[in-house]
Amino acid sequence: MASFKIVIVCLALLVAVACARRRDMMSDDELDFHLSKRGIPCACDSDGPDIRSASLSGIVWMGSCPSGWKKCKSYYSIVADCCNQ
């Protein structure tokens, strides 16, 4: 059992080292642009009540909306908000 734990710890360290590779840093504006383009679309209240015909003008942000964005859904969620610029 002890050798199994050692193997698990070694694998965890290997994954941690592999994930800790150097990444290029982006400015906040560039990061916001890239995140907004890769985000999950959501329907704002202004898009209408029917989700099938809505234009999905919002983007789902985890946590809360970043600066320059506003919450566009009337309901409250702890996990994510539907935001648009």
From Swiss-Prot:
Q: Give the signal peptide range.
A: 1-20
One CC-aspect GO term: extracellular region
Q: What is a GO molecular function of this protein?
A: toxin activity
Grouped into one coarse class, the protein's main location is secreted
Which tissues carry this protein?
Expressed in ectodermal glands and in clumps outside of the extodermal layer. Is not expressed in nematocytes. In adult female tissues, shows similar expression levels in mesenteries (gametes-producing tissue), tentacles, pharynx and physa.
List the cysteine pairs that form cystine.
42-82, 44-72, 65-83
Q: Which InterPro entries match?
A: Myo_ane_neurotoxin_sf
Disulfide bond keyword on record: yes
Q: Where in the cell is it found?
A: Secreted
The UniProt record lists the keyword Disulfide bond? yes
Q: Which UniProt keywords apply?
A: Cleavage on pair of basic residues, Disulfide bond, Ion channel impairing toxin, Neurotoxin, Secreted, Signal, Toxin, Voltage-gated sodium channel impairing toxin
Pro-sequence residue ranges? 21-36
The role this protein plays is: Binds to site 3 of voltage-gated sodium channels and inhibits the inactivation process. Is highly active on DmNav1/TipE (drosophila) and is only extremely weakly active on rat Nav1.4-beta-1/SCN4A-SCN1B, and on human Nav1.5-beta-1/SCN5A-beta-1. This reveals high specificity for arthropod over mammalian channels. In vivo, when released into the medium, this recombinant toxin induces impaired swimming, paralysis and death of the crustacean A.nauplii within several hours. Also causes paralysis of cherry shrimps immediately after injection at very low doses.
To which protein family does this belong? Answer: Belongs to the sea anemone sodium channel inhibitory toxin family. Type II subfamily.
Also noted in the record is: Nv1 toxin seems to be encoded by 8 different genes. 4 of them code for identical precursors, whereas 4 others code for very similar precursors. In the genome draft, 6 additional loci are also correlated to Nv1 toxin, but they are not predicted to be functional genes. This high similarity may be explained by concerted evolution.
Q: What is this protein called?
A: N.vectensis toxin 1 3
Q: Which organism is it from?
A: Nematostella vectensis (Starlet sea anemone)
Upper lineage is: Eukaryota, Metazoa, Cnidaria, Anthozoa, Hexacorallia
